Regions:
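Outer-membrane beta-barrel domain signature, strongest for Gram-negative TonB-dependent receptors
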Residues: 1-68, 73, 249-251
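Surface-exposed extracellular loop regions of Gram-negative outer-membrane beta-barrel proteins
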Residues: 107, 154-166, 177, 191-237, ...
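Repeated loop/turn-to-beta-strand initiation elements of outer-membrane beta-barrel proteins
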Residues: 55-58, 141-146, 196-199, 247-250, ...
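C-terminal beta-signal and adjacent terminal beta-strands/loops
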Residues: 305, 374-394, 423-491
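C-terminal beta-barrel architecture of Gram-negative outer-membrane proteins
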Residues: 347-426, 450-451
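Gram-negative outer-membrane beta-barrel transporters
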Residues: 138-141, 256-258, 277-386, 488-490
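Signature of Gram-negative outer-membrane beta-barrel scaffolds
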Residues: 31, 59-194, 321
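Transmembrane beta-strands of outer-membrane beta-barrel pores
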Residues: 64-70, 139-141, 150-156, 203-209, ...
C-alpha cells in the first residue's frame, strides 16, 4: 500500500480525526502535542596570558557554567475537541496499575486545553567550574603545547509534576546530586623540516561528565538515577604529516582512540517481560584506530584533482553491564547482566572510505565539479540488550536462534556520484555565488545509509512450543537523485 502511494497509508486523514473528536462529547480522542525543550545556559570565562620569554607563553583561566534544560509537553491542537484529561493513557487497561493514572497528583484530573502543559514537566541541571593552564612553546622549527583542565560538575533533576506511579520525592522535587571531576590532559609537539614539510604528534587523556539524560533511568517522570555513575574516560593519540609543493599538497594522519566507562540509557518495550522498561548500559568501551590520507593535485591552471581515503577499525572492546527496571514501579527485570559486546563493530562509521573529485575553475567565475565516493565495511549499530543471557541465552534455545541474537549484520558497500555547477559574481568588496548541486546522479533508491538492531523480540509458536527471534534491523536509506540550488552572498 505504501509503495502504491495509497493516500490512506501515505497521508494522515485529518478530516477523519476531527470527525472522531467531534463524536466524543468534547473530550479529545486525537490531539497534536509539542515536546518542548527550553534551554537556559549561562557561562562565565576569564582568560589570561603571560609571556615568560620570547618563546614560551603561559595561558590560564577559570570558567563557570550552568546548563538548565526544562522539558515538558504542550498541547498544540485538539483537532476540533474541547479538552483532554491529564492522565497516563497507557495504564487505563492495566489490571495492576489502572488506578494510578494521574500525571500530576498535585493537580488530579486536570483539564488540558490548547497551549497548556501536560504529561510531564522536569528540568535537568548541570553546574560546573573548571581551571585551565596551557603552555605554548614556539621556535623556528619546533613547537609544543601542553594543557591541563581540571573541573568539578554537579548534575541533578527537578520534577515539577508528582507522578502517581512514583509519589513524593520519587518524581517531584530535586533528585540526588551526582558529582563528577572531569579533567583533560593534552600534549602536542611538531617539527618543521622546511616550510613545505611538517610533522606533528599529539596525545590526550580525559574524563568527561556523562550526558545528564543518561544518568536517569526515566527522566520524564522519575528521579531514579543510574547506580554508581562515573565519568567516561578517553585516551587518544595522533600522528600528522603534511607536504606541500607546487603541484601536489599531501597530508596523512594515523590515529588511535579508546573510550571506557560509557553510559547509555533508553526506554523500550520488553517482549520477554511483557512490560515497558527503562534500561541503563554501563561500562561501555570502544576502540578506534586507523589511517587517513588526502591529496590535492593541480593538473593545470584551471583543473584540480582531489583524492582522499581512510581505513580503520572501530569496535567494542569490553562487555558492558545492562540493568533493566520496570517503567511502572522500578522493580528489577535484569541487574548488572553481562552483554557479549566485545568484538562487535561500531555502527554508523564506514571503516573503508575513498573519494575522488575533479574540479574545473573557468573564466568569468564559472566552474564545475564531479565526485565519486565509496564507503565499505559498515555495520548496523549493535544493541547490548540482545546479547545478555536473558535475551540471547533464554530466547536463543537453538544455535541458529542464538546466532541470530548475537551476530552483527554487515551493511552493503555504498557508492555515490555527485556533480555541481557554480557561477560567481564579484563586486568591489563582495561576492555572489549561485550553485546547482546534483546528488546521487545514478538515482539509486536502495542505498543503505545506516542502521541499528531492534530491541524488540518476536514470538514464534510452532505447535505447542514458543520460540523467540529478534526483529529485523532498522535501516535508513540515502536520498534518491536530488537537486539543490544555493545562493550565497559574502561581504
Amino acid at each position: 500500500a505504501w509503495l502504491a502511494r495509497d493516500p490512506r497509508y501515505t497521508q494522515i486523514d485529518w478530516d477523519e480525526l476531527i470527525r472522531q473528536n467531534r463524536m466524543a462529547g468534547g473530550h479529545a480522542v486525537y490531539a497534536l502535542e509539542d515536546r518542548v525543550e527550553r534551554l537556559c545556559n549561562l557561562a562565565f570565562d576569564a582568560s589570561f596570558a603571560t609571556e615568560a620569554d620570547a618563546r614560551l607563553t603561559l595561558r590560564y583561566g577559570v570558567s563557570l557554567r550552568r546548563e538548565n534544560t526544562r522539558s515538558y509537553k504542550q498541547m498544540r491542537d485538539l483537532l476540533g475537541a474541547g479538552y483532554v484529561t491529564d492522565i497516563d493513557r497507557f495504564l487505563i487497561d492495566d489490571d495492576t496499575y489502572g488506578n494510578l493514572l494521574q500525571n500530576d497528583l498535585r493537580h488530579p484530573g486536570r483539564t488540558v486545553r490548547e497551549g497548556d502543559r501536560f504529561g510531564y514537566d522536569y528540568a535537568l541541571t548541570l553546574r560546573g567550574a573548571a581551571l585551565r593552564l596551557q603552555a605554548d612553546y614556539r621556535s623556528d622549527r619546533f613547537r609544543a603545547d601542553l594543557s591541563v583542565v581540571l573541573g568539578s560538575d554537579a548534575v541533578s533533576r527537578r520534577g515539577y509534576y508528582e507522578k502517581e506511579l512514583f509519589p513524593g520525592g520519587q518524581s517531584y522535587g530535586p533528585s540526588r546530586v551526582m558529582r563528577f571531576t572531569p579533567y583533560t590532559l593534552k600534549a602536542a609537539a611538531g617539527w618543521a623540516f622546511s616550510p613545505r614539510r611538517y610533522i606533528e604528534i599529539a596525545a590526550a587523556a580525559a574524563a568527561r561528565t556523562p550526558r545528564a539524560g543518561d544518568l536517569f533511568f526515566q527522566p520524564l517522570y522519575n528521579n531514579r538515577t543510574v547506580d554508581n555513575p562515573v565519568p567516561e574516560r578517553i585516551y587518544a593519540a595522533e600522528l600528522n604529516c603534511r607536504l606541500t609543493g607546487p603541484v601536489v599538497d599531501f597530508q596523512a594522519a594515523f590515529f588511535a582512540a579508546m573510550t571506557l566507562d560509557g553510559i547509555e540509557t533508553r526506554t523500550y518495550y520488553d517482549d520477554m517481560a511483557s512490560v515497558y522498561c527503562d534500561m541503563a548500559v554501563t561500562g561501555v568501551g570502544r576502540m578506534s584506530c586507523g589511517a587517513e590520507a588526502a591529496a590535492d593535485i593541480r593538473l593545470s591552471y584551471r583543473w584540480l584533482l582531489s583524492l582522499a581515503a581512510s581505513a580503520g577499525r572501530y569496535e567494542y572492546i569490553r562487555d558492558p553491564r545492562v540493568t533493566v527496571l520496570s517503567d511502572v514501579d522500578n522493580s528489577a527485570v535484569d541487574v548488572q547482566a553481562v552483554s557479549r559486546m566485545g568484538g562487535c563493530e561500531t555502527g554508523g562509521a564506514p571503516q573503508l572510505t575513498a573519494l575522488a573529485e575533479i574540479a574545473w575553475f573557468g573564466p568569468k567565475g564559472w566552474g564545475c565539479r564531479a565526485s565519486a565516493g565509496y564507503a565499505g565495511r559498515r555495520y548496523v549499530e549493535p544493541m547490548p540488550l540482545r546479547r545478555t543471557d536473558r535475551i540471547a541465552g533464554q530466547g536463543g534455545i537453538t544455535r541458529e536462534f542464538f546466532d541470530a541474537f548475537t551476530r552483527q549484520e554487515r551493511l552493503p558497500d555504498a557508492f555515490t556520484l555527485d556533480a555541481a555547477l557554480f557561477k560567481s559574481f564579484r563586486f568591489e568588496r563582495s561576492r555572489l555565488t549561485a550553485s546547482l548541486m546534483l546528488r546521487n546522479l545514478t538515482g539509486e533508491a536502495d542505498t543503505v545509509y545506516g542502521g541499528y538492531e531492534s530491541l524488540r523480540v518476536r514470538r514464534i509458536r510452532p505447535g505447542d512450543d514458543t520460540l523467540y527471534a529478534p526483529h529485523a534491523s532498522r535501516c535508513t536509506y540515502a536520498w534518491p537523485r536530488s537537486f539543490y540550488l544555493t545562493i550565497s552572498y559574502r561581504f
